[in-house]
C-alpha cells in the first residue's frame, strides 16, 4: 500500500479528535480498534489513530483486521493484531482509547476486564459511541425505519456505560457530546439531542 497520509492534514477542530488528543499529550496510549473498519481511514483527516500519534509519547494500536494491521505496520504504525475482548500485552498504559468500538462488541465484560489489566492506578479509559438520541436519528425513526449499522450489537449511552463500568470498578469522570456536522452545533436543542456522538472518560474507582 502506497499512501502518503501526511498529505492530508488532521482535522484538529473535530470534536472527537479534540476530546481524545488533548488527553494524549505526553502519555503512553493504547488505541483499540484503531483501523476503523478499512484502510480508507489511513488518509482521512478524521482518523483518530493518526491524531493520537501526533500527541502521544508512545502509541500502540490493536485491531482484529489482520491484513489491514499488516499494511499499516508497513507504513510505520506500531499496531498489533488482536481482539479487544481477549488481548494481553503484558504492560500498562496511561490512556486506553476505544473509539466507536463498544457498539461492535460481543462481550462488554471481557472488553472491560482486558482494559483493566492494562491500566495502572492513574490510567484513564476513553470510550466514544454514537448517540442514539441524536435529533436526526429520532426524525428518521419517526418517519422511516430506525437508522442502524448492521455491524452494531447495541446502542450505548453515557448513563448505561456508567452503570456497566461501575460493576467492574470504573467511574465516569467526564462526558461530552459532539458532531462531525457543524450545523448540529447551532441547533437550539439540548446537547443530548443536538449531537451525533458522545465521548466519555473513565478512571479506576477509589
Language-model features: locations:
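A short SAM/SAH-binding and catalytic strip from SAM-dependent methyltransferases
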Residues: 95-106
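Conserved SAM-binding loop
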Residues: 72
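Short beta-strand element of Class I
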Residues: 52, 57-60
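Conserved SAM-binding strand-loop segment of SAM-dependent methyltransferases
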Residues: 75-86
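S-adenosyl-L-methionine-dependent methyltransferase catalytic module, highlighting the catalytic core
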Residues: 2-14, 42, 85, 106-206
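A short acidic, Gly/Pro-enriched loop at the edge of an enzyme's catalytic core
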Residues: 85-96
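Conserved class I S-adenosyl-L-methionine
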Residues: 27-44
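Conserved SAM/SAH-binding beta-strand->alpha-helix loop
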Residues: 65
Amino acid at each position: 500500500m502506497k499512501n502518503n497520509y501526511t498529505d492530508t492534514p488532521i482535522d484538529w477542530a473535530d470534536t472527537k479528535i479534540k476530546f481524545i488528543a488533548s488527553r494524549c499529550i505526553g502519555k503512553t496510549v493504547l488505541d483499540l480498534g484503531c483501523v476503523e473498519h478499512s484502510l480508507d481511514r489511513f488518509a482521512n483527516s478524521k482518523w483518530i489513530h493518526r491524531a493520537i500519534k501526533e500527541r502521544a509519547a508512545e502509541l500502540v494500536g490493536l485491531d482484529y483486521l489482520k491484513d489491514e494491521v499488516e499494511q499499516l505496520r508497513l507504513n510505520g504504525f506500531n499496531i498489533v493484531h488482536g481482539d479487544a475482548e481477549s488481548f494481553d500485552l503484558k504492560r500498562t498504559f496511561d490512556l486506553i482509547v476505544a473509539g466507536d468500538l463498544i457498539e461492535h462488541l460481543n462481550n462488554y465484560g471481557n472488553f472491560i476486564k482486558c482494559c483493566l489489566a492494562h491500566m495502572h492506578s492513574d490510567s484513564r479509559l476513553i470510550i466514544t459511541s454514537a448517540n442514539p438520541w441524536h435529533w436526526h436519528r429520532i426524525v428518521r425513526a419517526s418517519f422511516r425505519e430506525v437508522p442502524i449499522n448492521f455491524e452494531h450489537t447495541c446502542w450505548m449511552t453515557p448513563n448505561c456505560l456508567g452503570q456497566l463500568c461501575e460493576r467492574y470498578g470504573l467511574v465516569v469522570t467526564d462526558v461530552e457530546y459532539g458532531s462531525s456536522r457543524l450545523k448540529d452545533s447551532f441547533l437550539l436543542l439540548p446537547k443530548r439531542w443536538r449531537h451525533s456522538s458522545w465521548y466519555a472518560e473513565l478512571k479506576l474507582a477509589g
